[in-house]
């Protein structure tokens, strides 16, 4: 506390000296002709002085002040910036699966307070106006000392929802890097890229996204590296791009091997790289960390801390209307003794304990108070697992339950990051998140069976 007070006093002294110089200039004889103006200006400057001291005190308490270059050793090795919570977890879990301490924070302003080696930040910018999303990214760049991180990763939605391309343009412009590499493919989940076109194959069917054209529309004109190249070929193409003054490159990827080649090729250059992609690129990056990265991160493959399922119920917060999620819900209703909460007719506490509890979340309608009402009477020991689907829903639910950060562990299955609530009434309980389009049809049933075994109804019993 004494150190804090001394720091504030020191800042105030410096600010006072700056204002004093301005006041002396105003008192110069050439300004004496307008004493009223001088008096007013001096009063204004005194007001500014108070504001400077207050802002610095507030920034220090909230962890918003920039960190000097000499403090870089205290920062995390990797920072991930995503536009929603599930996206942040999708990318960050790639590192926790390798045994690296990884934390996802809901409030990016508090990110620098984390001691984790990998920190993921949710800017909550997917569903807001473009200019506001741009402003939030500019704030991240300004308030966090991004140069202190070994790698910067901008997570983009694998089907490019929200303000994806405006955020990419802002990131390339604002975030410190020598080279920006974009590789949005996620082959493990049926998302590939050829000739600047991303093809998505899932339960909905097959769709294509002309990424190249949309990048051009956002004012970006990247160099292109086709799929099927070796890491040496990728490195060579990147070097040529840099030599010719092009610091933004788009890489196709049709397979996992293509993504690995992109990462290995990028690391051969030994320059600061801004990575832009989906969780597929994050996994490739985590699996191909060089010795240089190893100096900053503690990789412990196979030593991921796990929390064993505890007694209690599984609560499914369903905030996605994606067809994949709807199919998963149909399967859950058929195979478990599921209890569905209605905000119009709340369930009794005793009823809730019969089976997994499903709480519908409608973005723009469901409030934090509604979430708290659905969980009324349930304590930490009553809950084994919290499952949340839908990015905006995840943020809403976590805030309602007092969860400000998640310590990630691994994936329940690809695309379903699994972690532990760090704080709030449900601290220590497992939290599983899922983007709407991810997961096999029976994944919710398997979550219920894992974390609430007695809830599972045999298929023959359902007839």
What kind of feature is each model-predicted range?
Residues 383, 392-443:
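Conserved, well-ordered active-site substructure
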Residues 304-374:
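Redox- and metal-dependent alpha/beta enzyme cores, enriched for Fe-S-associated oxidoreductases
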Residues 35-38:
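Short hydrophobic targeting helices and cationic amphipathic motifs
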Residues 12-15, 23, 32, 48:
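Short hydrophobic alpha-helical segments enriched in small aliphatic residues
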Residues 91-93, 163-167, 191-198, 260-265, ...:
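Short acidic, glycine/serine/threonine-rich loops at helix termini
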Residues 278-287, 294, 299-302, 309, ...:
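Short, flexible loop segments at boundaries between secondary-structure elements
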Residues 81, 120-122, 154-155, 181-185, ...:
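Short beta-strand segments
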Residues 74-78, 101-105, 109, 117, ...:
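Cap/lid and interdomain-hinge subdomains that line or gate substrate/regulatory clefts
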């Amino acid at each position: 506390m004494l150190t804090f007070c001394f720091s504030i006093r020191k800042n105030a002294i410096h600010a006072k000296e700056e204002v004093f110089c301005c006041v002396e200039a105003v008192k110069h004889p050439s300004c004496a002709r307008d004493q009223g103006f001088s008096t007013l200006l001096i009063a204004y400057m005194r007001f500014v002085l108070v504001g400077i001291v207050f802002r610095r005190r507030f920034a220090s308490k909230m962890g918003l002040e920039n960190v000097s270059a000499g403090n870089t050793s205290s920062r995390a090795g990797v920072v991930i910036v995503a536009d929603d919570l599930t996206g942040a977890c999708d990318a960050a879990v790639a590192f926790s699966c390798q045994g690296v301490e990884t934390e996802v924070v809901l409030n990016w302003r508090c990110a620098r307070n984390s001691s984790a080696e990998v920190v993921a930040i949710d800017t909550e910018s997917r569903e807001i106006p473009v200019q506001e999303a741009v402003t939030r990214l500019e704030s991240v760049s300004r308030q966090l000392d991004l140069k202190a991180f070994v790698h910067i990763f901008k997570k983009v939605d694998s089907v490019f929802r929200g303000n994806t391309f405006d955020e990419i343009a802002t990131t390339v412009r604002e975030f410190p890097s020598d080279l920006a590499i974009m590789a949005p493919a996620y082959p493990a989940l049926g998302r590939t890229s050829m000739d600047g076109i991303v093809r998505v194959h899932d339960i909905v069917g097959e769709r294509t996204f002309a990424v190249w054209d949309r990048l051009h529309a956002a004012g970006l004109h990247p160099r292109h590296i086709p799929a099927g190249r070796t890491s040496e070929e990728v490195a060579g193409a990147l070097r040529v791009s840099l030599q010719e003054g092009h610091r933004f490159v788009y890489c196709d990827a049709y397979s996992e091997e293509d993504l690995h080649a992109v990462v290995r090729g990028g690391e051969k250059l030994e320059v600061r790289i801004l990575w832009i992609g989906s969780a597929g690129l994050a996994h490739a990056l985590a699996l191909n960390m060089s010795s240089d990265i190893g100096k900053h991160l503690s990789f412990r493959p196979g030593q991921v801390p796990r929390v064993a399922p505890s007694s209690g119920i599984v609560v499914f917060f369903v905030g996605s209307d994606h067809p994949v999620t709807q199919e998963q819900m149909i399967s859950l209703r058929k195979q478990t003794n599921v209890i569905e909460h209605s905000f119009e007719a709340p369930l009794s506490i005793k009823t809730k304990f019969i089976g997994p509890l499903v709480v519908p979340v409608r973005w723009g309608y469901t409030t934090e108070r509604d979430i708290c009402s659905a969980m009324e009477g349930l304590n930490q020991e009553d809950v084994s697992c919290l499952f949340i689907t839908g990015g905006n829903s995840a943020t809403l639910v976590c805030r309602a339950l007092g969860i400000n950060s998640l310590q990630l562990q691994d994936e329940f299955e690809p695309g379903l990051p699994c972690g532990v609530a760090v704080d709030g009434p449900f601290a220590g309980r497992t939290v599983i998140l899922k983007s709407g389009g991810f997961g096999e049809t029976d994944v919710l049933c398997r979550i219920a069976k894992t974390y609430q075994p007695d809830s599972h109804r045999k298929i023959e019993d359902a007839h």
